[in-house]
Amino acid sequence: MKKTAIALLAWFVSSASLAATPWQKITHPVPGAAQSIGSFANGCIIGADTLPVQSDNYQVMRTDQRRYFGHPDLVMFIQRLSHQAQQRGLGTVLIGDMGMPAGGRFNGGHASHQTGLDVDIFLQLPKTRWSQAQLLRPQALDLVSRDGKHVVPSRWSSDIASLIKLAAQDNDVTRIFVNPAIKQQLCLDAGNDRDWLRKVRPWFQHRAHMHVRLRCPADSLECEDQPLPPPGDGCGAELQSWFEPPKLGTTKPEKKTPPPLPPSCQALLDEHVL
């Protein structure tokens, strides 16, 4: 498991010094009926909605990065989740990266978030709204111990667990990625109501936020869904494997060349950028 500082930096690092991808040259959503195209890690979106940055229930971080675009289903999910959180007195929901105006590949920080169906949400629920300065330069609250084996008790709360559970119980949500230690704590705390845990998937980093992914909309015919998570709550051998030391002889996988774009996404780039 990577050290805390490196893990958090990977999510919050500024991309200003990296070469822009063609998708970053598209500054407004592409007109048309909303269509998520391709896969979460190789796709785009037509007709994206803009998440309103003003809301009583949530706040949007790093608005200067302009990553608050997504499929209308994603915008409605964020509004729905944050309203439920407010009704339960959990606090203000802090919204991180969604996607770019036309989706597509980032120049760093994300492999997915390309079809307008992904959103990062801080696992903090402030009772007092953040200032503009705090939102522009958010400070992540690392919930995981240095050795990566458990959450930090003084930072974990039932409210955080409730927020994750609310998101997982939403019918549009297909996966929620969190650090393995966070998944482990959810497993310990869940009690008999465990069906929602199937959607909560352990993944590298994700020590301070959850990454929520929605299913492909029914009318997005070129959208590629992932297979459903394995049956069960995911709290057994699969989860424990994340805490085992790496096998001898394993090497870091080589960086792969990005696959060709879906034809509709390439056509979108050809028309609007190239």
Curated annotation (Swiss-Prot):
Query: What is the name of the protein in this document?
Result: Penicillin-insensitive murein endopeptidase
Localization terms from the record: Periplasm
The EC number of this protein is 3.4.24.-
Q: Which InterPro entries match?
A: Hedgehog_sig/DD-Pept_Zn-bd_sf, Peptidase_M74
Q: Which UniProt keywords apply?
A: Disulfide bond, Hydrolase, Metal-binding, Metalloprotease, Periplasm, Protease, Signal, Zinc
**Location (main, coarse):** periplasm
Reply yes or no: does the keyword Membrane apply.
Answer: no
Q: Which family does it belong to?
A: Belongs to the peptidase M74 family.
Task: Mention one GO biological process in which this protein takes part, according to its record.
Answer: proteolysis
HAMAP family in alphabetical order: MepA
Q: What does this protein do?
A: Murein endopeptidase that cleaves the D-alanyl-meso-2,6-diamino-pimelyl amide bond that connects peptidoglycan strands. Likely plays a role in the removal of murein from the sacculus.
